[in-house]
Design a protein with these regions (language model features):
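Conserved, structured core segments of small domains
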Residues: 1-138
Length: 138
């Protein structure tokens, strides 16, 4: 079955609303995760730390430049994801509609490209890297 990523996006306002009712949000999210586990569709789920604690590595010239925090012009921030194994985009959308999100949040639904859809040299590079990592030689 295809895999779909449900990408949780929020704004400063929606994140503030979420933090105002964090205990309730955690409880309802746990119930939602249990539903997905019972249905056998959940592969992974993670929430991200505050974007102010992250860094951005920007490739704009000869050497990468590292800056604190998210992009300056970003209005929506990637807050976390659910990775699902479902039959179709429509099924992924139905799960996305059930996410206990606060007003102002958005859920982006994206299919994960299969290995057979990658350019030939990319797929080989992934296999080579996996083999190198298993031996400790990169």
């Amino acid at each position: 079955m295809p895999k779909y990523m449900l990408i949780m996006r929020g704004t400063d306002e929606s994140n503030a609303a979420m933090m105002a009712s964090i205990e309730e949000g955690i409880a309802t999210t746990r119930l939602f995760i249990e539903e997905m586990l019972k249905a056998g569709v959940l592969l992974a789920a993670e929430g991200l730390d505050d974007p102010g604690r992250g860094v951005v590595v920007h490739f704009s010239g000869e050497a990468p430049v590292v800056t604190d925090g998210p992009y300056g012009e970003t209005k929506e921030l990637f807050g976390g994801y659910f990775l699902l194994d479902v039959a179709s985009q429509q099924e992924a959308v139905e799960w996305a509609k059930r996410i206990p999100a606060v007003t102002g949040s958005k859920i982006e639904v994206r299919r994960v490209a299969g290995e057979d859809e990658m350019p030939q040299d990319t797929a080989g590079s992934v296999e080579e890297r996996a083999g190198s990592e298993s031996t400790g030689r990169i």
